[in-house]
Amino acid sequence: MTLHSSIDRVTDRIRERSRNTRDSYLKKIARAAEDGPRRAHLSCGNQAHAYAAMDDKDDMATTRKPNIGIVTAYNDMLSAHQPYERFPDLIRRAGHAAGATVQVAGGVPAMCDGVTQGRPGMELSLFSRDVIALAAGVALSHDCFDSALYLGVCDKIVPGLVIAAATFGHVPAVFIPAGPMPSGLPNDEKSKVRQQFAAGEVGRDALMAAEMASYHSPGTCTFYGTANSNQMLMEFMGLHLPGSSFVNPNTPLREALTVAGVERAAAITRLGNDYLPAGDVLDEKAFVNGIVGLMATGGSTNLVMHLPAMARAAGVLLDIEDFHDISESVPLMARVYPNGLADVNHFHAAGGLGYMIGQLLEAGLMHQDVKTINGTGMDGYTAEPRLDGERIRWEAGSTDTLNDRILRPVSDPFARTGGLKQLDGNLGRGVIKISAVAEERHVIEAKARIFSDQEQVKTAFRAGEFTEDTIVVVRFQGPRANGMPELHSLTPTLAVLQDRGLKVALVTDGRMSGASGKVPAAIHISPEASTGGPLARVRDGDLIRLDATMGTIDCLAEDFDTRKPVAFDPASSSEGMGREMFAAFRAVAGPATEGAGVVV
């Protein structure tokens, strides 16, 4: 199928924008590549240190077997990462069977936003992405590895690992998922209880029971937030094996897919005939395919910030106009909570990513001619994995949706566009996701209420101060102010106001959770208020117009442009819960519209 003109045009624009940076990047990774095992270039003393704890040290010292490094984000705090506890032993066995040696190169931190939501620790969350990239870089700097396996799932972990994989772009990279937990209490029922609690209609016991029935076992949370958007992204970009993203943990199929991933890591090193450095996978076309997947699935707005940071590490420069233009051409094909009632397990059972990729390829809406760890183009990602004894066999995937309430073809989508809109106006530049927002709420014009943090909003709500249509402005939430915490804990509060019949919207230089849904939210507004951005000039009572249809965000006050910005007071977020250690990050973080990066 001929590539759609808009996808072709955006790809060419990215390629031209990135010409110099991508060329420099490719030259860098070419210089870093060496013939022979990576470890062979170390001195005997260096090598002895590297092999000292290994049972197969003789193989490592005397043979050309590839050595696979594991970078793991295992901990018990994240249900999504707990299954990784047993992966190193499984990977070692699989590696040895494939003629390779295996070492855990290092661990990286992994933070659960579900635990820190609305807490001071959330102000470390975004920066943890760059810490993860740095930690993975330290692990790989031993320069002993012919390929790398990256074990990570959740919000900042995958982006951080991709930044590291791109930085060490001469090293082949395979990403190994852990899979979603089995379905528990339906996400919409959990959300209803949260709103009831926010409204004072149920107590803490009812809320706790609902939360624990929803988050109940090892594996990724089942709603389609940032973690599961990451898993989609890795498959659409060719860094996962086909059909591996949404297979439940601790199952024979999950284990067999992990083994297959190890085999690919052993096969694509420079020691064989199929050398595939990570930097060759992470090109302009791969990032466009990732954005296409984000739009077709209605994925997390956090990736609008993470993808530019990931791409920059590979010399590719993305802009939010690229997201907007792709969204205008790619239809919304899935309804997964918060954009629908289904969870990711239901989505996978309905045909999942394989069906979706097949549809998008047939419509010319994604690039087929890309390099993937599977050794195929994207057509190989229409296949579904099946167990054949203890081995994986890929079979042709479904060409029809198995549940059109969850997954639809390109010809009959849930919406004509992907639902992500670029916003521009005198309040700055940002984005809004409207795939779960009712059409009558795409345009909101109302008076502003100004807040400096989300707790102030909740206090005003409890005091009964919201009695008319309101634009809730929460400013000083950008990366340089307080690390840009998610404002997801506002969702139940604003949803209650909306259910009471008020027209409400959020405008912020902060960000929302990938689980946020039905309330209009203009997010990532840049320049941020703490650097003197326009949000710092808004006053209580100003009339603001948020128009997602036209893509505009404006303060209508006549004297707006002549006002002096309110100064930011960093005292409330400069220390406590580790925040003092991240002052250097806050001082140099880039704007949200460019990835909010520290190390890229």
Please state what every model-predicted region is.
Residues 83:
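Glycine-/small-residue-enriched capping loops at alpha/beta junctions
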Residues 86:
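Acidic/charged coordination and interface sites in well-structured regions
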Residues 105-143:
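N-terminal small/polar loop signature for handling phosphorylated ligands or for N-terminal nucleophile
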Residues 129-136, 141-148, 458-466, 471:
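Contiguous domain-boundary segments centered on the initiation and propagation of an alpha-helix
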Residues 140-161, 172-176:
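A short, small-residue-rich loop immediately preceding and capping a beta-strand
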